[in-house]
Amino acid sequence: MKIKRLFFGACLGAILMGCVPASVSTPAITPGSTIPPAITPNDTSLPTFTPSPTPTPEARIDTAEAAIFNGNYDTALVEYQAAFDNSVSPEIRAAALWGLGRVEHAIKNNGAALETLWQLSSQYPTSPNAVRAYFLMGEIYKALGRNEEAAKAYTIYLALRPGIIDAYAQEQRGDAYAAAGNDTDAITAYKAALADPGIEDSPAVQVKIAQADVRLGDTTTALGIYDSIYAATSNDYLKAQMDLLSGQIYLTLGQPDQAYQRFLHTVDNYPLAYDSYSALVALVNAGIPMDDMNRGLVDYFAGQYGYAHDAFQRYIDANPKNDGTADYYMALTYFGLGQYEAAVQAWDGFIKGYPDNPHWAAAWNGNASLPGRAYTQWYYLSQYDLAAQTLLTFVKQAPTDANAPIYLQEAGRLQERNGKLEEAALTWDRVADEYPGSDLVPQALFQAGIIRYRLGKYSDALISFQRDSILSTVLEDQAQSLFWIGKTQSALGEASAAQAAWLQTAAIDPTDYYSLRAQDMLVNRPIFESLPVVNLNQDPTAERAVADSWVRVTFNLTPDTDLSTPGSLLADPQLIRGTEFLTLGLDTQAGIEFDALGTAVEQNPADCYRLGNYLLSLGQYYPAIFAFRQVLTLAKMSTQSQTLAAPVYFNHIRYGFFYRDILFPAAQKTGFDPIFVMSVMRQESLFNKYANSGYAQGLMQITPGTGQFIADNLGWPPNYTTDDLYRPLVSIGLGTSYLMDQRLRFNGDLATALAAYNAGPDAAAIWRDLSGPDTDLFVEIIRFDETRNYIRSIYEIYGMYRSLYATVP
């Protein structure tokens, strides 16, 4: 054991001195105080599985790779272990160890992961992944707090695989050294990261260097770095951070005047930055006077509403004649404190006293991010009448203001929310009558028509829809109004006229929601009706050959242009880095590189096409779809309907059946049409298993709280954590289960189930109660634009799948 340790130390020393030739066997790094045991064919520490007939080790590796891609770690462990146990091939065994190490790392079984990666690097040093094992060991050591060992592992990786992801690996190495208290080597690593052209966030690494310099006592260098970052950036948040960090250095140097000058500068200039609040706290603690207006702003944006209130009050008391901005923010502080009545009164005073203030129009209404009077009245105080009257008063007082038609439209929405449907319809009529040039006119007339349809006043509704149809200039608006003209004529018993309207609607855009629903009406087909059979017998090789030829002809490429490989892209540093990151399991970093490369080649149709195919082969569906879409855009196929004229290869990828080995069983288990679930998944994440928007995560965009709720109810997966949402197996399993619950709750109504999935079951229930059994009316009554568009978009996706995969007679 001692010999092994000495050998490791000697190799590491040679690497650090730059003396390791490319052909050297990869040195091993010990994961602990003892050499870990090797995984042997008789090892029983992992589960074994012997299917019949017995797959070959090569087939088991393929199965395991598919399983790890799907987040099915149990199957991956079994298959990798079986491949190792049943093969004498060094290549197979090395691949199995690499797979086992990755899975154990993913499930945070760090001890086993280190043992496995150690075995790979020591027993199979010529394997392509033996060097990568050192990077993963570095990640694991860092997670365990064994930072010196982490730094050494990164060092070996960089020495044996230089010039690939140096910027990233050097930064990780620097972080490990810094955490270990070795700031000198940390600075060296960080500087190496900065020197690499692949650096992603240069200021962040520069800050790390400066912080290490401070710890080493070199404050002069650190201050110089902060000043250079400040001078080079236009980002106010970064400028505030530099002011704060510089000021903190001056405090440690015993130069408080210099420090407070920096702190005052950030408070006065960058009120939105939280670092400005940290500077403010330092100033307050030191008793340094400052402008109360700026102090109040910093406090407000830091969420310190009580302190903000006091600062604004002092400013107002000291400056009774001012422009009113302090009064405006005073109202916002009341709102932040939950004193909604006081906030409304404060906005009242501001509105009456400061009509020339730039915040005057916003104060009348507001929104979720920056509330105002009407928003607070209806959303927090349930004063719908008063809120609507606030907005109507604004229109009366400022009829020429750019916000007037917007507020008039919103007043109608508030009246509708309050059940005053006749008033709402008349208010929406006013938008068209008083602001005929507004872009809001088509939707205002449409909403007026929907109100009259709900009231059973079909003749009046028909007039509103017809007027909307005449004034609409956007095809989608025209399809919307024509569809409802047909619905209204049908309600009036005018069947022939309704059929004519729907025929006209269907012809506008066969991929649009309203055109699709018109097609449904013409054949008496309910929304989301399943295909009797899904045809998945495509020939991707033949389809790609057709697409290759089409790309050559469409973009005037020479007949011998090779589109079968990535070509020169294989030498592109971004593609090389992205592929390496992906192999290491760093999908987010890989995505950054692939996205950047997609942007770089976006005007080159051949390279866009090559990149799309390459990314598809890696299972990077999200960026691949964007690359293929860009090819169609360059071919002047900007609309969805225009893409139908392209070779089917493009749309079979853009609307692919990805993750089908998980999705089909999950759909069958929960009683869903697989196309329906696939459409939801495409809408939610565009097949990006690491999608993260707001609080929602994964393929099915489940929030952590909802995920925990579903997992608790199902008792699956075992030991559930939020990170499991990024596993396709878990995301699809939980998502389909939750959708099934909503479908059951709403008696099989899929549109309402989707609304519940997106906006919550309580809101969906309210909308369904208002609409009754009419699904089309339900969609229009939905009060959240996001949810309404969500259902429409999913049905458009569903329509594409239906047209692409319907069985050909």
Where are the regions a protein language model picked out?
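Alpha-helical segment of the N-proximal tetratricopeptide repeat
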Residues: 55-82, 86, 106, 290-314, ...
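Short solvent-exposed coil/turn linkers within tandem alpha-helical repeat scaffolds
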Residues: 51, 84-93, 121-132, 157-168, ...
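Ser/Thr-rich, Proline-interspersed low-complexity disordered segments
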Residues: 19-63, 82
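Structural motif corresponding to the intra-repeat A-B loop/turn of tetratricopeptide repeats
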Residues: 70, 107, 144, 180, ...
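Residue-level recognition of tetratricopeptide repeat
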Residues: 65, 102, 139, 175, ...
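Catalytic glycan-binding domains that act on GlcNAc-containing polysaccharides
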Residues: 404-409, 418-423, 427-428, 434, ...
